[in-house]
């Protein structure tokens, strides 16, 4: 199986490429950088075939993917800077990447009859209430530019293809890039106490674990919408931080505050990021391990001196 992976200089793309290699599949990576610019950790992705590609360039997308002719496209590339996406001078670019780029990829996937995986987010919903979001819920109500453009990407895939997996995730962390765990470890190292919000609820997603599930998925034709965070229950960012510091051996005090007390961010954030993952097991997929286990494994692998 030949698999074309976008966004390999990011957290998830890096891990998907390594998982493909582990299983003996042919992975070809792409990102906008002239050459692979992710962490040089000696893993398979650092030596794998790589092509530079701007996904907003329809002509280039069509030519490169048609020439490679993969069986599957795993589309991890996206604009993910949620607050910066709100800037008036960025909205057009964010839409060009998250919606336009995704449409370009979906069009060529259809032309070559490839399966497509599109990574999405709980931000396509309004983030209110306490009920976990069902993967097949169509009550979309994005609360910011990032969520709106990721929803437009979802619709591009679903309206163009029949052989697709739309996989929503939340609170992502991985080896190859910035994330909440790395940020909190840096902050905790230099402060006696930190304030963290306790009224935004969800579950983290470890890209190493998610990559395994995504490759499991592309081995099947069980297409559709899925939610795929780690198991272990729903938590707040405050709970998450306490677990991070416990595993890292930090004594930093964590003080719970409300979103209102913490202060507004430029983009509105969801209070309810609970994602219902029951469809995974219903379709024969192995769910991800618990987030507690994932955090421990992740911190054990981190170079704490160079976060």
Language-model region placement:
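N-terminal Rossmann NAD(P)H-binding glycine-rich loop of SDR-like oxidoreductase domains
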Residues: 1-23
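Conserved glycine-rich Rossmann-like NAD(P)H-binding loop of the short-chain dehydrogenase/reductase
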Residues: 25-37
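Rossmann-fold cofactor-recognition segment
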Residues: 43-57
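NAD(P)H-binding glycine-rich loop region in Rossmannoid oxidoreductase-like domains
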Residues: 55-97
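Catalytic helix-loop patch of NAD(P)-dependent Rossmann-fold dehydrogenases
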Residues: 92-104, 124-167, 172
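NAD(P)-dependent short-chain dehydrogenase/reductase
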Residues: 155-202, 208-209, 216
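Mid/C-terminal beta-alpha module of Rossmann-like enzyme folds, strongest
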Residues: 190, 213, 220-265, 271-272, ...
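Amphipathic terminal alpha-helices
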Residues: 291-307
């Amino acid at each position: 199986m030949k698999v074309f992976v976008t966004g390999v200089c990011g957290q998830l793309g890096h891990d998907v490429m390594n998982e493909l290699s582990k299983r003996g599949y042919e992975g070809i990576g792409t990102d906008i950088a002239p050459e692979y610019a992710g962490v040089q950790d000696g893993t398979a992705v650092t030596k794998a075939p790589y092509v530079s590609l701007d996904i907003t360039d329809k002509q280039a997308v069509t030519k490169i993917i048609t020439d490679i002719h993969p069986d599957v496209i795993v589309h991890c590339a996206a604009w993910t800077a949620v607050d910066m996406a709100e800037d008036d001078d960025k909205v057009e670019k964010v839409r060009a990447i998250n919606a336009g780029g995704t449409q370009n990829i979906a069009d060529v996937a259809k032309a070559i009859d490839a399966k497509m995986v599109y990574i999405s987010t709980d931000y396509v919903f309004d983030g209110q209430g306490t009920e976990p979001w069902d993967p097949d819920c169509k009550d979309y109500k994005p609360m910011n530019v990032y969520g709106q453009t990721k929803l437009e990407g979802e619709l591009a895939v679903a309206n163009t293809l029949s052989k697709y997996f739309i996989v929503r995730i939340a609170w992502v962390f991985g080896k190859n890039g910035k994330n909440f765990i790395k940020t909190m470890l840096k902050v905790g190292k230099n402060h006696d106490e930190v304030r963290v919000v306790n009224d935004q609820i969800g579950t983290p997603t470890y890209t190493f674990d998610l990559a395994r599930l995504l490759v499991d998925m592309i081995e099947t034709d069980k297409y559709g919408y899925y939610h795929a965070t780690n198991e272990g229950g729903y938590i707040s960012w405050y709970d998450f931080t306490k677990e991070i510091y416990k595993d890292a051996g930090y004594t930093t005090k964590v003080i719970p505050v409300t979103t209102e007390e913490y202060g507004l961010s430029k983009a509105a954030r969801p209070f309810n990021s609970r994602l219902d993952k029951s469809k995974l097991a219903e379709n024969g997929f192995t769910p991800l391990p618990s987030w507690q286990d994932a955090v421990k494994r992740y911190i054990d692998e981190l170079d704490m001196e160079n976060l």
